[in-house]
Amino acid sequence: MTVQTSKNPQVDIAEDNAFFPSEYSLSQYTSPVSDLDGVDYPKPYRGKHKILVIAADERYLPTDNGKLFSTGNHPIETLLPLYHLHAAGFEFEVATISGLMTKFEYWAMPHKDEKVMPFFEQHKSLFRNPKKLADVVASLNADSEYAAIFVPGGHGALIGLPESQDVAAALQWAIKNDRFVISLCHGPAAFLALRHSDNPLNGYSICAFPDAADKQTPDIGYMPGHLTWYFGEELKKMGMNIINDDITGRVHKDRKRLTGDSPFAANALGKLAAQEMLAAYAS
């Protein structure tokens, strides 16, 4: 007998009118173990350069009907790229706009993954006690030790990051100083912070989560309502080219901008980023 799982969003009792994804959508799009593989870096980086992770610090995303989607950074999209980069020798620091702790979509955590979960536990304090992004930005110069900025996905990236002057300043610094910018899924929404000032990403091509897919997710109860705006439309208005219109786990390199389309791209993006950064920084 087949057990039918509900497509109704699940109540998040920690906040009024807030919801987690439905049982059905979680059964389709999450797994207790990840697809982590290919972590093979026999000559890891041994220098001082590291990764700056710009993480989400807000959990609740309003939808068009007033209901709140309980979100944050997607664990797979955050941890798999970082696992590869760490294995390749690159340490990382975490910053949020407020300096308050990173919010994760714990309902997507691969809680039975014997590699990813110990990695998360090892670095949990970085996410619980991040730097304040404004303080990081104030210290940036041409000699700063950050080799890359990484903006993880999850719908939490739609909250605050697209309007942040500090996010814009960090991205402008990275691009001006020939650093890598790595992102996937909804993470590229952070690039919208550049639209109100100098936009060095005009003309770049990226992968990202398709707006068309976001418009379908309420049908299966992934979100409790529709988004009030769509980041892909806005990225195109600022001169960026989104090369995918579906979700296949695709990754893309445009100079030092490395992007992926979804959580299904997290492992491949991690491998791409590790390989590209080792090639750039290997002594």
Curated annotation (Swiss-Prot):
Catalytic activity: N(omega)-(1-hydroxy-2-oxopropyl)-L-arginyl-[protein] + H2O = lactate + L-arginyl-[protein] + H(+); N(6)-(1-hydroxy-2-oxopropyl)-L-lysyl-[protein] + H2O = lactate + L-lysyl-[protein] + H(+); S-(1-hydroxy-2-oxopropyl)-L-cysteinyl-[protein] + H2O = lactate + L-cysteinyl-[protein] + H(+); N(omega)-(1-hydroxy-2-oxoethyl)-L-arginyl-[protein] + H2O = L-arginyl-[protein] + glycolate + H(+)
EC number of the protein: 3.1.2.-, 3.5.1.-, 3.5.1.124
GO biological process terms held by the UniProt record: DNA repair; methylglyoxal catabolic process to D-lactate via S-lactoyl-glutathione; protein repair
Source organism superkingdom: Bacteria
Main location: cytoplasm
Gene3D superfamilies (alphabetical): 3.40.50.880
Entry function: Protein and nucleotide deglycase that catalyzes the deglycation of the Maillard adducts formed between amino groups of proteins or nucleotides and reactive carbonyl groups of glyoxals. Thus, functions as a protein deglycase that repairs methylglyoxal- and glyoxal-glycated proteins, and releases repaired proteins and lactate or glycolate, respectively. Deglycates cysteine, arginine and lysine residues in proteins, and thus reactivates these proteins by reversing glycation by glyoxals.
Subcellular location per the Swiss-Prot or TrEMBL entry: Cytoplasm
Taxonomic lineage from the root: Bacteria, Pseudomonadati, Pseudomonadota, Gammaproteobacteria, Enterobacterales
NCBIfam families for the chain: PRK04155.1 (NF003168)
Description of how the protein assembles with itself and partners: Homodimer.
InterPro entries tied to this protein: Class_I_gatase-like, HchA, Prot/Nucl_acid_deglycase
Active site positions: C185
Binding site for Zn(2+): H86, E91, H123
Main EC class the enzyme belongs to: hydrolase
Family indicated by similarity: Belongs to the peptidase C56 family. HchA subfamily.
GO cellular component terms given for this protein: cytoplasm
Name of this protein: Protein/nucleic acid deglycase HchA
GO MF, any single term: thiolester hydrolase activity
Keyword set, alphabetical order: Cytoplasm, DNA damage, DNA repair, Hydrolase, Metal-binding, Stress response, Zinc
